[in-house]
């Protein structure tokens, strides 16, 4: 597994100021999801990591739903930057 393969999309000065912003939280969850996904490709039966991945996916999904309700422009920009799919609506 390569640790430093993820390039930061948020500039360093913005990271220091906005660690609580929805965009930063979604960005950090996305990095964790990518790391866990690459880990699970090697270790398919690691059920605790699978559970952690599902929990992080749920948190990211809730944050993205919140952001899409509050500010659709920022939501679309973030989805494009992180290259993640828009969730299906029920």
Swiss-Prot record:
GO terms for cellular component: chloroplast; ribonucleoprotein complex; ribosome. The keyword DNA repair does not apply. The keyword Ribosomal protein applies. Keywords: Chloroplast, Plastid, Ribonucleoprotein, Ribosomal protein. InterPro entries: Ribosomal_uS15 (IPR000589), Ribosomal_uS15_bac-type (IPR005290), uS15_NS1_RNA-bd_sf (IPR009068). One of its GO terms (molecular function) is structural constituent of ribosome. It is found in: Plastid, Chloroplast. It comes from the Eukaryota. Pfam families: Ribosomal_S15. One of its GO terms (biological process) is translation. Part of the 30S ribosomal subunit. PANTHER family: RIBOSOMAL PROTEIN S15, BACTERIAL AND ORGANELLAR, SMALL RIBOSOMAL SUBUNIT PROTEIN US15M. Belongs to the universal ribosomal protein uS15 family. This is Small ribosomal subunit protein uS15c. It comes from Acorus calamus (Sweet flag).
